[in-house]
Regions:
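Cleavable N-terminal export/targeting peptides
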Residues: 1-25
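A broad, low-specificity signal marking well-ordered, structured residues that form hydrophobic/aromatic
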Residues: 15-18, 31, 105, 183
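Short glycine/proline- and aromatic-enriched beta-strand/turn motifs that initiate or cap beta-hairpins
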Residues: 18-71, 82, 188
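Transmembrane beta-barrel outer-membrane domains
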Residues: 24-26, 37-41, 78-84, 133-141, ...
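Gram-negative (and chloroplast) outer-membrane scaffold detector with strong preference
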Residues: 50-145, 150-159
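Internal, hydrophobic beta-strand segments that form the core of beta-sheet-rich folds
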Residues: 161-164
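Membrane-helix boundary connector in multi-pass membrane proteins
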Residues: 168-169
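Outer-membrane beta-barrel "beta-signal"
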Residues: 177-189
Length: 189
């Protein structure tokens, strides 16, 4: 009887040991920093992605920008909008068979906002004059993108992403087109 119990426990232990996959298949979480946006636009971008299986993943990207050069252009009238923040949930589908190098397609929604300026004509006592009004905007964009991702040593990620969306709510103040472009470096665990 003791031998049967011992063999049953041994088989159960061996069966349990084979349930946890190794390598990339066993790592379901990833964090990334977009260095292209940081260097080119002084925009901070941090992303988290959760792999649901071999082909699908969900993620959230958070951006914040407060660049002195862009703010000066805005104050001098060279641009009408400044995107300040973006919160972007996304869903991705892997288009390639490989786990370590693959193309992907994504759909996303983005809550984004920033500053808006416009020249407005006022009329007081039959005297017209123009003044600059500054206000905030908030909008929601929907869009799609595509990219390429590769892993080094099954944990360090390099990702290239290009995507575009359309703002849908406050189209008078917000930019018409919303872009997601980046070169990100991350860690999968």
């Amino acid at each position: 009887m003791k031998k049967i119990i011992f063999i049953a426990l041994l088989c159960a232990q061996l069966g349990h040991a084979q349930d946890s996959p190794s390598g990339l298949a066993g790592k379901h979480n990833e964090v990334r920093v977009d260095l292209l946006s940081l260097v080119a636009l002084s925009k901070y971008n941090l992303s988290y992605e959760r792999y649901l299986g071999e082909d699908w993943s969900l993620g959230l990207s958070v951006n914040y920008a407060n660049n002195k050069r862009v703010n000066d252009d805005f104050d001098e009238g060279n641009r009408n909008t400044i995107p300040k923040y973006e919160i972007t949930p996304f869903v991705r589908y892997k288009l390639s068979k490989s786990l370590s190098r693959f193309y992907f397609a994504e759909v996303f929604a983005s809550a984004n906002g920033g500053d808006f300026r416009e020249i407005t004509r006022f009329n007081e006592n039959n005297v017209g004059y123009y003044d600059i009004e500054k206000s905030d905007y908030f909008d929601v964009a929907i869009g799609a993108g595509a990219g390429y991702k590769m892993y080094i040593k099954e944990q360090f990620a390099i990702e290239l992403l290009v995507g575009f969306g359309v703002n849908t709510i406050d189209t008078d103040k917000s930019p018409d087109v919303f872009s997601r472009v980046g070169l990100s470096f991350g860690y999968r665990f």
